[in-house]
Amino acid sequence: MDFSRQSFHRSLSSSSQGPALSMSGSLYRKGTVQRLGAAPSVYGGAGGHGTRISVSKAVMSYGGDLSNGSDLFGGNGKLAMQNLNDRLANYLEKVRSLEQSNSRLEAQIKQWYETNAPSTIRDYSSYYAQIKELQNQVKDAQVQNAQCVLRIDNAKLAAEDFRLKFETERGMRIAVEADLQGLSKVYDNLTLQKTDLEIQIEELNKDLALLKKEHQEEVEVLRRQLGNNVNVEVDAAPGLNLGEIMNEMRQRYEVLAQKNLQEAKEQFERQSQTLQQQVTVNTEELKGFEVQVTELRRTYQNLEIELQSHLSMKESLERNLEDVKARYASQLAAIQEMLSSLEAQLMQIRSDTERQNQEHNILLDIKTRLEQEIATYRRLLEGEDIKTTEYQLSTLEMKDIKKTRKIKTVVEEVVDGKVVSSEVKEIEESV
């Protein structure tokens, strides 16, 4: 686009430096009209580049009092009227040129707004909805994290309960093992007693065999003694039958030995059976305890695996939460950066709009003053009071347009190549 903001501002500045109206060359003074020289450019800016309002040179100078206005139209009054007509034509041409420049500038401003400025006010409701959605997602993640923490606490409590049960069962297992060791000692004692009883039975059998042998030897000795004796027949009471007596004694000893042996066997069998039953019961209990210990060990391993899985899931959720927080923080920083940039652009657009409004007001003021000057010349042509004209022209001549200068400073804070914050400072000073 051919329109340049700098050139436009520079032209307006140059146009606003001088007075509103400059009666070039000469001024109307009270009582005299001095010689009019060549007039330089009255307005060189505001779109009227190269436009000059020239005034014809007067051939003669006037003197005397112009309060009555009689000499203005007499003698050399025709030259003055011709000069005023030329100046009026130049002013009218200047007015038309300024109107055309104003129209052109308005078209350029409108075109610039259409190309640079947004056609409508930006609607940030979509960003608000996105921010609300992100906040809801963060809240959901926090709720899920709290639920995971609660599940982890429950798992820890369950693991603690199982640990207590495991300690209790381990104490019971230790007690059962101690009982088994005690029963093993009892079993060993019974085995020793059995061995002692077997040894005693063998010794008794040996004693019985020895007694039988000694008895047989004694019987043989007695028989030999009886065989060597002389038979003497006397009338006496019949003697004792030693053989029968020995047989009876032998039978009684055999019955007694058989009875003792039978009782020892029965007692040994009873004790062995009782011990065998106890060993069987203890073995079954030991197998049951071993099964329970195996199940508890398996349960403990499963709980340990579950605890490790929960811990890994917790770590994963914490990492995901940190990633989500970092991502949302970066997105929020990007949104804030974009909002700051948009606010800076909006402030820039507002300042440009205000500056262009001021420039437009300056142009309107120039146009108004030109219209006032045209009206003044019209009244001069119609023969109005010259004193009033002189006073108005002097007032317009002495009135200057204030020139102001705006200094705009943009301060941006950059972190890791990203704009974190942006601040626009604007200072207005008069020149």
UniProtKB/Swiss-Prot annotation:
InterPro entries: IF_conserved, IF_rod_dom, Keratin_I
Linker 12: annotated segments: 223-245
Region named Coil 1B: 131-222
Region: Head, residue numbers: 1-76
Tissue: Expressed at low levels in the more differentiated suprabasal regions of the small intestine, and at higher levels in the colon, mainly in the upper region and in scattered cells throughout the remaining epithelium. Also expressed in epithelial cells of bladder, ileum and stomach and at lower levels in pancreas and earskin. The phosphorylated form is nearly exclusively expressed in goblet cells of the small intestine and in the lumen-proximal cells of the colon (at protein level). Also expressed in jejunum and duodenum.
Post-translational modification: Hyperphosphorylation at Ser-13 occurs during the early stages of apoptosis but becomes less prominent during the later stages. Phosphorylation at Ser-13 also increases in response to stress brought on by cell injury. Proteolytically cleaved by caspases during apoptosis. Cleavage occurs at Asp-235.
Gene Ontology cellular component annotations, sorted alphabetically: cytosol; intermediate filament
Region named Linker 1: 113-130
PROSITE patterns with a match to the protein in the record: IF_ROD_1, IF_ROD_2
SUPFAM superfamilies: Intermediate filament protein, coiled coil region (SSF64593)
Domain IF rod: start-end pairs: 77-388
Annotated segments matching region Disordered: 1-23
Function: Plays a significant role in maintaining keratin filament organization in intestinal epithelia. When phosphorylated, plays a role in the secretion of mucin in the small intestine.
Miscellaneous comment in the UniProt entry for this protein: There are two types of cytoskeletal and microfibrillar keratin: I (acidic; 40-55 kDa) and II (neutral to basic; 56-70 kDa).
Name under which the protein is recorded: Keratin, type I cytoskeletal 20
Upper lineage: Eukaryota, Metazoa, Chordata, Craniata, Vertebrata
The encoding gene: Krt20
